[in-house]
Amino acid sequence: MPQAALRLDKVTRSFSQGREVLNVLTGADLAVNPGEIVALVGPSGAGKSTLLQICGLLEKPTAGEVRIGGISCGQLSEDRRTLLRRDHLGFVYQYHHLLPEFSAAENIVVPQMIAGIGRKPALARAAELLAKMGLSERQDHRPGQLSGGEQQRVAICRALANRPKLLLADEPTGNLDPNTAERVFQALLDLVRGEGLAALIATHNPDLARRMDRIVTLREGKVVAA
Ligand SMILES: Nc1ncnc2c1ncn2[C@@H]1O[C@H](COP(=O)(O)OP(=O)(O)OP(=O)(O)O)[C@@H](O)[C@H]1O
């Protein structure tokens, strides 16, 4: 059996809200295999974003274990968590969060240069990803000169720039009109499949969820098969 790209064992997460304790995750187990694209669904407030933040090493669970590519993350120093995030994980959010003063290509070059990749190969990788997303003509445009769908495509390219092994996406097309969302989502799936990486994608849209390899639901703080 290959090592899971992501594995959660008995993950819990509670928040204190005044005198109350809110138990959002109550023992979530999940494995995402290499190359597998998994849809994460569940009603609003079920804890999808919380789960993704924990998988992305942006938040720590109250208890339980998170493994990324077989690496147990619980005892890692902040520096090691940052490196693991940089080298293994890509993130796409509902809002693109692109750098407004930089071109589409530069937005994809920046994270690569932070990871120590030279400017020339970084530019080549940006051009390759933008071409796959049908955005070659737009590579010198700034985000403000792009449509919402184009901006989100650039954000997807940026997330894949450093060749992560796992993509985490939180409602990646939730901010787009239905037709644009449909096209951008298909482009995202094609790119993720083409690059052979694993993905965990939260969505409220059942049609989009059905296009993934498997659907899991968050119910009462646990992950259950849909
Ligand atoms: N930092 C926090 N402090 C306190 N409560 C929080 C915090 N983060 C999330 N919560 C609570 O945890 C619950 C789950 O939130 P979360 O955003 O993970 O749900 P979600 O399934 O992603 O919802 P949506 O589909 O609406 O985005 C909510 O009740 C939320 O208010």
Swiss-Prot record:
PROSITE patterns (alphabetical): ABC_TRANSPORTER_1, ABC_TRANSPORTER_2, LOLD
First-tier enzyme category under EC: translocase
Assembly and interaction partners: The complex is composed of two ATP-binding proteins (LolD) and two transmembrane proteins (LolC and LolE).
Entry membrane topology: Peripheral membrane protein
Protein name: Lipoprotein-releasing system ATP-binding protein LolD 1
UniProt organism field: Rhodospirillum rubrum (strain ATCC 11170 / ATH 1.1.1 / DSM 467 / LMG 4362 / NCIMB 8255 / S1)
Subcellular localization: Cell inner membrane
Tree of life domain: Bacteria
Binding residue positions for ATP: G42, P43, S44, G45, A46, G47, K48, S49
Known role: Part of the ABC transporter complex LolCDE involved in the translocation of mature outer membrane-directed lipoproteins, from the inner membrane to the periplasmic chaperone, LolA. Responsible for the formation of the LolA-lipoprotein complex in an ATP-dependent manner.
InterPro entries on file: AAA+_ATPase, ABC_transporter-like_ATP-bd, ABC_transporter-like_CS, ABC_transpr_LolD-like, MacB-like_ATP-bd, P-loop_NTPase
GO cellular component, one term: plasma membrane
A biological process from GO: lipoprotein localization to outer membrane
Sequence similarity: Belongs to the ABC transporter superfamily. Lipoprotein translocase (TC 3.A.1.125) family.
Coiled coil regions in record: none
UniProt-recorded Gene Ontology molecular function terms: ATP binding; ATP hydrolysis activity; transmembrane transporter activity
Transmembrane regions: none
Domain ABC transporter per the UniProt entry, residue ranges: 6-226
Main location: membrane
Keywords from the UniProt entry: ATP-binding, Cell inner membrane, Cell membrane, Membrane, Nucleotide-binding, Translocase, Transport
One Pfam family cited in the UniProt record for this chain: ABC_tran
Tagged with keyword DNA repair: no
